[in-house]
Amino acid sequence: MTLADLKKPTSRATPSTEETFTRVRTPRRENNEILATVESLLGANRLRLRCMDGVVRMGRIPGSMKKKTWIREGDVVIVVPWEFQNEKADVIWKYTRPQVDWLERKGYLKG
């Protein structure tokens, strides 16, 4: 018996016919979370956000997200408005492209 006989056969070029299911995080109303689209990057971890409630807010990327997640113009994010200044918000989640497609199909994103 050789070493080649002991190796498991690999299937490199076989496409999977199974659909992959991913859980998509939706905004939680009890935590005052809102969906928003990034309009522009302002620098110094700040951005201009167009929220789904119709308000344009200045967003802040907290330090816990700064290095891990890169946010660009046009990205869809979840924000939490500040309690004492409604025109400012913290970004807490960024969606990937397949997740944005799912949100559009389910009616979470308007227009």
Curated annotation (Swiss-Prot):
Database matches in NCBIfam families: eIF-1A, PRK04012.1-3, PRK04012.1-5
UniProt-annotated stretches for the region Disordered: 1-26
One GO MF term: translation initiation factor activity
SUPFAM superfamilies according to UniProt: Nucleic acid-binding proteins
Keyword Ion transport: no
Keywords: Initiation factor, Protein biosynthesis
Biological role: Seems to be required for maximal rate of protein biosynthesis. Enhances ribosome dissociation into subunits and stabilizes the binding of the initiator Met-tRNA(I) to 40 S ribosomal subunits.
GO cellular component: cytoplasm
Domain S1-like: 22-96
Protein name, as recorded: Translation initiation factor 1A 1
Biological source species: Methanosarcina acetivorans (strain ATCC 35395 / DSM 2834 / JCM 12185 / C2A)
Family (UniProt): Belongs to the eIF-1A family.
GO annotation (BP), single: translational initiation
Keyword Transmembrane helix found: no
